[in-house]
UniProtKB/Swiss-Prot annotation:
It comes from the Bacteria. Pfam families: PapZ_C, RapZ-like_N. SUPFAM superfamilies: P-loop containing nucleoside triphosphate hydrolases. This is Nucleotide-binding protein GOX0815. The keyword Nucleotide-binding applies. GO terms for molecular function: ATP binding; GTP binding. Displays ATPase and GTPase activities. The lineage of its organism: Bacteria, Pseudomonadati, Pseudomonadota, Alphaproteobacteria, Acetobacterales. NCBIfam families: PRK05416.1.
Length: 321
């Protein structure tokens, strides 16, 4: 189960500590492009929204900080094919890491947002909004197909969208595969950004133990309870073996991000235990880049926040010659 992240051209082995980040942010109207740009600006990126396409190279060629450029159907001279051509030209710039971000949401969600804000859809002058959403989806389809990261905001509240962007782009890390390990609860919905999902609901549930119920998979008593299930060693071993096979292949094909999600009934005990164990073991066995941990349901309840299991390397401490 995946929100497919597509490979980008260029070097993908290790980190390019000296690279400047250039992000092209596009997507459907109402899907959160402006919100993403605001977060990137807070993270220190220079943000330019909707410049004429023929100015993109000039903007990117200027020396300076990381750059985020917003592009959508309102951009002067917009054609998806032209945007992709400009993207390939950007990737020829020296010492630049160039990525395409695409924001999307379900049509009914977009319709609800436009209705709530009373904004006019850029492709609709009169009548209902839905035909405009469908037309824009078709116009932007080539960009979504080539995006390095697709962000579906259908059920992503603004604070979680901000957290997602901060975890992806708030570091100074360079090229490489960033792995996100996420626990979640199935009743709250599948994480749309997940590339791989594993279901841990068949394991013994600590929820039904009165002593363990208020605890989480961050507590040792819960960890030992979950691991005592006879099926746990084989289940975890299969997940570990699969990730040790797949993640290096993701690196080889140029993926920039991989989200591995583990789900259970409440997102509190079993899935948290497994994510924590993966975060402990995988950095020793899989040669990828930064690795982050997010316990979605615990974060929503204020019981945990995202953290780096393997932080991005600090360019100032790079000792390579």
């Amino acid at each position: 189960m995946a929100s497919a992240n597509h490979p980008e051209s260029g070097s993908i082995s290790g980190y390019d500590h000296g690279s400047r980040r250039i992000l092209i942010v596009t997507g459907l109207s109402g899907a959160g492009k402006s919100s993403i740009l605001r977060v990137l600006e807070d993270l220190g990126h220079e943000v330019v929204d909707n410049p004429p396409l023929n100015l993109i190279q000039a903007l990117a060629s200027r020396a300076g900080q990381n750059l985020a450029i917003g592009i959508d159907v309102r951009s002067r001279g917009f054609e998806a094919s032209r945007v992709l051509e400009e993207l390939e030209r950007l990737r020829l710039l020296p010492d630049c890491s160039v990525q395409l971000l695409y924001a999307t949401a379900e049509p009914e969600i977009l319709l609800r947002r436009f209705t709530a804000t009373r904004r006019r859809h850029p492709l609709v002058t009169s009548g209902t909004i839905l035909p405009g959403i469908e037309q824009e989806t078709a116009l932007l389809a080539p960009l979504r197909a080539n995006a390095d990261l697709v962000i579906d905001t259908s059920d992503l509240p603004s604070p979680e969208l901000r957290q997602l962007i901060e975890t992806r782009f708030g570091s100074t890390g360079g090229e490489g595969l960033t792995v996100a390990l996420m626990s979640f609860a199935y009743p709250s919905g599948l994480p749309r950004e997940a590339d791989m999902v594993f279901d841990a609901r068949f394991l013994r549930n600590p929820h039904y133990d009165p002593t363990l119920q208020p605890m989480t998979g961050l507590d040792e008593a819960v960890v030992q309870y979950v691991k005592s299930d006879p099926a746990y060693p084989a289940f975890f071993g299969h997940i570990q073996s699969l990730l040790e096979l797949v993640l290096p292949r993701f690196v080889a094909e140029g993926k920039k991000y991989a989200t591995i999600a583990i789900g259970c009934s409440g997102g509190r005990h079993r899935s948290v235990t497994i994510v924590e164990e993966l975060a402990r073991i995988l950095p020793k066995t899989v040669p990828v880049g930064p690795m982050m941990v997010l316990h979605r349901e615990l974060a929503r309840k204020g019981l945990a926040s995202w953290r780096w299991a393997v932080p991005p390397q600090d360019p100032s401490q790079d000792t390579t010659v």
